[in-house]
Amino acid sequence: GLDSKGFEGGIISSVVPPLTTVLEKMCEKYLGFKPILVGPGIKSGIKIKYDNPKEVGADRIVNAVAAYHKYGGPVIIVDFGTATTFDAITADFDYLGGAIAPGIHISSEALFKRAARLYRVEIAKPERIIGKNTAESMKSGIYFGYIGLVENIVDKMKEEMGGGRIFTVATGGLAPLICSGTKKIDAVDLMLTLDGLKLIYDKNKN
């Protein structure tokens, strides 16, 4: 294990306030430092153009910072989490906003729970789009339907951003699976959020 006295500091990005408090107290009690919290007032360098900047989730800001520093701008970030978020960043490091859609797990769970004769299936890339049985048909609808959602939102965001070359990066646990079925994503970066946390930590630690 690691020596608890060996940590110089830490940073927390959380969209669950009760958990944020628990993590903050844990760091102070067991690790000996007060963590930096990603939220209003944090130095990130990004200019947030949302109607109410406080509404932007900490994870979206962290991803935006990492994507801009790693890939430049303009850039679109697609994060496959509990919800799937789409975020638009300009060449001048402005956070324009984005879109929030139900995550693929939430969508599939709704299908299982609302349709009495349907059952849970593995979320996987089907061999074909035309299913030959109920399980195959559900896998096809879930997988290819979700790819359609992603591609359409990315295309429309690019249009609103003025077109041209706009890099698109995806992150989140299901990014490799979903992005294997589309050419609209330029890179899958599973370290994006952690890289963003490090960048923001370095900017605020002093």
Positions of the model-derived regions?
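Acidic, glycine-rich active-site loops and adjacent beta-strand->loop/helix elements
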Residues: I42, A83-T84
